Amino acid sequence: MLGMLRWTTAGESHGQALIATVEHMPAGVPVTKDEVSYQLARRRLGYGRGARMKFEQDALTFLTGIRHGLTLGSPISIMIGNTEWDKWTTIMSSDALDMEDPDNVAAMSSGRGAKLTRPRPGHADYAGMLKYGFDDARNVLERSSARETAARVAAATVARSFLRETLGVEVLSHVISIGASEPYTGAEPTFADIQAIDDSPVRAFGKDAEESMIAEIEAAKKAGDTLGGIVEVIVEGLPIGLGSHISGEDRLDAQIAAALMGIQAIKGVEIGDGFEEARRRGSEAHDEVFLDDNGVYRNTNRAGGLEGGMTNGETLRVRAGMKPISTVPRALKTIDMENGKAATGIHQRSDVCAVPAAGVVAEAMVTLVLARAVLQKFGGDSLSETKSNIDTYLKNIEERMKFEGLEDGA
């Protein structure tokens, strides 16, 4: 759709830089490098992260679309430089290499430059090598790497500011469980709890759940294995009517699910009570509507804030399930694509568990989808125009919900 908020990323894991591009963001949205850096640092959080996180820094440059801390309405480009690029200049060179040069031969025949011919089960390596005709899995894994999500988090920081300025809402996440840990079942956190969540080594909201998750990670680390888990994203204060029932692609739950499934290693998504709803009878599955002097309210939120593909005024609640990291330290069985012989998967440096970071990436994707939905609903070339359109809509909703002659208890 012309004029619709769009985002894309470019770059490889060990390339010179990652690029995040955001198009059709209104003018006047405040953006700072400090805020982007803060969100990128949150993405690196988590007990069980690998050694790479200790030196994987994010060198930021705002290339286009921002002037004096405000968006211009033109395409926004943010570059995240690779601080280790000097170690990869030959291996990831965009120029053709002179293989008569002994330095190039040495760089490309051993260590990180050696051809990777043993695809890792669970990764994009095998299908990617066949689909694109590669004899080196590096041509696949460099782009399929979850390092790419840093660019998505950067793009979403602009969208976060937009949602904050227009609706006054924030997006948060927390980890429900890791591996077979005891899942968190306590009170739903609010944005006021975000610092406490980020201070947790596993981004858990609850000490018992945290301790169970850490124990799982320690056991997996000792066994030379990896873990997945479940994260939850929560957004309070969304207006009624984002999304639409008109067609499948317009349904906000479909858009959110697609965005979350597009995150590396995410294998399942549920909105609200999700799969648990399938076990209930209809009389126990839906959120009844009531009205009092303070307005419409509900006693439950099983739908997770979405009905008929639209926000219904309740808290948005969505969960995503991440599979265990595919790069297993003890290496899984595979074949060598060079000769067809049995082999073990190549072992790239990786984490035991990246679920805490996945929560931050899930926040980013939900944020981008919500910002797009807000602009689809309210439009606006500038932040002030969008805010004015929202104010008018909310006043109309308020007027619509005034019922004349309603008797007490009716």
From Swiss-Prot:
Reduced FMN (FMNH(2)). FMN binds at residues 143-145, 264-265, 308, 323-327, 349. Signal peptide: none annotated. NADP(+) binds at residues 43, 49. One of its GO terms (molecular function) is chorismate synthase activity. It catalyses: 5-O-(1-carboxyvinyl)-3-phosphoshikimate = chorismate + phosphate. It comes from the Bacteria. Pathway: Metabolic intermediate biosynthesis; chorismate biosynthesis; chorismate from D-erythrose 4-phosphate and phosphoenolpyruvate: step 7/7. InterPro entries: Chorismate_synth, Chorismate_synth_AroC_sf, Chorismate_synthase_CS. Its EC number is 4.2.3.5. Keywords: Amino-acid biosynthesis, Aromatic amino acid biosynthesis, FAD, Flavoprotein, FMN, Lyase, NADP. It holds the Pfam family Chorismate_synt. Disulfide bonds: none annotated. Its cofactor is FMNH2. One of its GO terms (cellular component) is cytosol. Transmembrane segments: none annotated. GO terms for biological process: amino acid biosynthetic process; aromatic amino acid family biosynthetic process; chorismate biosynthetic process. Homotetramer. This reaction introduces a second double bond into the aromatic ring system. Belongs to the chorismate synthase family. This is Chorismate synthase. It comes from Corynebacterium glutamicum (strain ATCC 13032 / DSM 20300 / JCM 1318 / BCRC 11384 / CCUG 27702 / LMG 3730 / NBRC 12168 / NCIMB 10025 / NRRL B-2784 / 534).
